[in-house]
C-alpha cells in the first residue's frame, strides 16, 4: 500500500510540475519535455528513421518540399522552430512528423497526390501535429506509462516482462493519434494551407483517396490511416473550415496547381524497388546483390534496407538476414557474439551451393529465467567482398519444425543468374496526355495498362473508372509494368 501511495504522489507531483502551455490552444497541459528536449528527441530519432527507410535521391523534388515546408512553417504557431522535411524511399502511403519539427513524406504518398493543394493540405496537417505538440504529448504519456510499469515491477515479477517500452526512433512512428488530435491537425492544416495560398478543400478529396486505399500498414511502416484515425465528419468539416478561412483572407488567391504538381512527380519510383529485393512464388530475390533464397510457407518476410526478417506466424521462429561486419568468419562471429550477448557452443566450416560458409551454434549468456530457452544458429556466407549472415532463432515446442524450415531457407541460398530477374526495374509514374475524350478506363486501355491494374490506377489518379476525361488532360500511368 505504501508503494502504491508513493507512486500516486510521485505521478501527481509530475503532473503539477511538468505542465506547459500549448502553442496552439494557449492551454496548459501535461508535458514531460521542454521544447529543447523535444528538438533533441527529434534529432536523435531522425537517423533511425532514415536508416530504416532510406531517403529518396531526387534533388528537385526535395527542393520543392523544402520550399513549401519552410513557407508554411513561417505562418505556423511555432514559426521560430527549425523544421526539417525529408522524402523517404518507401512505397507505403504515409506522411508523419516527429516531435521537434521533423516532417516526412514517403514517395508512396507523393505518388498519390494529384495536385499541389492536396500535398499542401497534408503538409499543413503534419506541421499542425508539431505545432500543437501532439507527438511530444503522446511521448509524455508513454513516459508516464513506463514510470507506472517500472514502479509496479517491484511488486509483480510478471509485469516486469512488459516494462520494456521503446523510447525514441521507430517507436514514435507507430504512435497513434486520437481523433481529437486529428481534428485539430485538420483545422491547422486548413489554416496553414489557406495562408500560403492553397485550396485546402483539396485535402478532403485526398482523404477520400486514403479511404479507398484502406488503413492497413505494409510491413515495417504503418499506412497513414493506421496512425491518423479519421474524424467521423472529416470531409464536411474540412470543407466548412476552408470556406471560413477563405472568407478570412479576402485578398488571398487559392490555387490547386494540378498540372505543375503532376509534372514534378513524373518518373517517380512507384511500388517496391525489385533491385532491392522482391518475393515471387515463395522465393526472395535480390538482383542488386545477385542472390536468392526460398521463404518458408506461411512465414512473413519483411525487407528493410539494413536487413531481411522472416517470421513464423506464432512469433517463435525468426530468421534474420543481413550483411555481417568483419572481413572473415572469425571477425564476423566475434561481432555477432559481442553485439547480442551470446556465447559460442560449436562451429564448423561448410559449403552452401558453391559458397564458402561457416555454421555456429550459439547460446545466450544470461537467458531470462522462467522463459522457454532459445535455439540460436549463425550461418556466415562469403561472397567476394560481401559477408552474408543468417541468424536463426527458435523457441518453444515447435523448435524442430522451425529449425527445419529455416535450414531449408539457408540451404537454398544461391547465386541469381536469371537475366529477367536480374534486370527487373522499379515501376515508375509516367505523366501522359490523354489522346481523346472518353472514360478513364478507356484512357488506361489506350496506354495498354493491364486490366488487373485499372482499379489501382483509378485510385492513384483520384478518379473512378467511369469518370469522363477530356483530350490533352494529364493523367498518371505506369512504366516498367511488372509481369503478371
Predicted feature locations:
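Short solvent-exposed coil/turn linkers within tandem alpha-helical repeat scaffolds
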Residues: 396-400, 450, 463-466
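Signature of long, low-cysteine stretches enriched in small and polar/charged residues
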Residues: 336-386
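Primarily a LysM-type cell-wall glycan-binding module
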Residues: 181, 421-451
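Sec-dependent bacterial lipoprotein signal peptides
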Residues: 1-19
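Extracellular LysM carbohydrate-binding repeats and other cell-envelope/extracellular binding modules
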Residues: 453-484
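A Zn2+-metalloprotease active-site environment signal
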Residues: 19-287, 292, 305-307, 311-316, ...
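Surface-exposed amphipathic alpha-helical segments
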Residues: 120, 245, 301, 390-428
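Residue-level recognition of short, solvent-exposed, well-ordered loop/turn junctions
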Residues: 40, 183, 294, 464, ...
Amino acid at each position: 500500500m505504501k508503494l502504491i501511495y508513493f507512486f500516486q504522489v510521485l505521478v501527481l507531483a509530475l503532473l503539477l510540475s511538468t505542465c506547459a502551455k500549448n502553442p496552439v490552444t494557449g492551454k496548459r497541459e501535461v508535458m514531460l519535455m521542454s521544447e529543447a528536449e523535444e528538438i533533441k528527441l527529434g534529432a536523435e530519432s531522425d537517423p533511425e528513421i532514415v536508416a530504416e527507410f532510406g531517403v529518396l535521391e531526387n534533388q528537385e523534388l526535395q527542393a520543392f518540399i523544402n520550399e513549401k515546408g519552410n513557407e508554411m512553417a513561417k505562418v505556423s504557431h511555432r514559426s521560430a522552430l527549425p523544421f526539417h522535411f525529408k522524402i523517404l524511399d518507401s512505397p507505403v502511403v504515409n506522411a508523419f512528423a516527429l516531435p521537434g519539427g521533423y516532417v516526412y513524406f514517403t514517395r508512396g504518398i507523393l505518388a498519390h497526390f494529384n495536385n499541389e493543394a492536396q500535398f499542401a493540405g497534408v503538409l499543413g496537417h503534419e506541421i499542425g501535429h508539431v505545432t500543437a505538440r501532439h507527438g511530444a504529448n503522446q511521448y509524455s504519456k508513454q513516459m508516464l506509462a513506463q514510470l507506472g510499469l517500472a514502479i509496479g515491477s517491484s511488486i509483480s515479477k510478471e509485469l516486469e516482462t512488459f516494462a520494456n517500452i521503446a523510447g525514441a526512433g521507430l517507436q514514435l512512428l507507430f504512435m497513434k493519434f486520437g481523433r481529437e488530435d486529428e481534428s485539430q491537425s485538420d483545422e491547422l492544416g486548413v489554416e496553414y494551407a489557406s495562408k500560403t495560398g492553397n485550396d485546402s478543400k483539396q485535402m478532403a478529396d485526398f482523404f477520400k483517396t486514403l479511404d479507398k486505399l484502406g488503413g492497413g500498414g505494409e510491413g515495417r511502416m504503418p499506412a497513414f490511416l493506421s496512425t491518423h484515425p479519421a474524424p467521423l465528419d472529416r470531409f464536411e468539416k474540412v470543407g466548412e473550415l476552408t470556406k471560413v478561412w477563405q472568407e478570412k483572407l479576402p485578398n488571398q488567391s487559392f490555387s490547386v496547381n494540378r498540372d505543375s504538381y503532376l509534372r514534378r512527380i513524373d518518373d517517380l519510383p512507384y511500388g517496391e524497388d525489385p533491385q532491392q529485393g522482391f518475393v515471387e512464388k515463395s522465393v526472395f530475390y535480390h538482383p542488386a546483390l545477385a542472390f536468392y533464397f526460398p521463404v518458408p510457407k506461411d512465414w512473413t518476410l519483411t525487407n528493410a534496407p539494413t536487413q531481411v526478417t522472416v517470421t513464423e506466424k506464432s512469433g517463435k521462429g525468426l530468421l534474420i538476414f543481413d550483411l555481417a561486419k568483419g572481413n572473415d568468419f572469425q571477425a564476423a562471429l566475434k561481432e555477432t557474439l559481442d553485439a547480442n550477448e551470446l556465447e559460442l557452443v560449436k562451429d564448423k566450416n561448410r559449403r552452401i551451393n558453391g559458397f564458402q560458409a561457416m555454421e555456429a551454434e550459439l547460446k545466450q549468456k544470461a537467458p531470462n529465467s522462467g522463459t522457454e530457452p532459445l535455439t540460436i544458429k549463425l550461418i556466415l556466407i562469403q561472397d567476394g567482398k560481401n559477408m552474408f549472415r543468417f541468424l536463426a532463432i527458435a523457441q518453444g515446442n515447435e523448435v524442430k519444425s522451425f529449425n527445419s524450415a529455416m535450414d531449408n531457407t539457408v540451404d537454398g541460398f544461391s547465386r541469381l543468374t536469371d537475366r529477367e530477374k536480374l534486370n527487373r526495374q522499379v515501376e515508375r509514374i509516367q505523366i501522359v496526355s490523354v489522346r481523346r475524350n472518353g472514360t478513364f478506363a478507356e484512357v488506361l486501355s489506350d496506354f495498354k495498362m493491364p486490366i488487373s491494374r485499372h482499379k489501382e490506377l483509378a485510385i492513384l489518379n483520384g478518379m473512378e473508372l467511369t469518370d469522363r476525361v477530356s483530350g490533352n488532360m494529364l493523367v498518371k500511368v505506369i512504366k516498367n509494368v511488372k509481369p503478371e
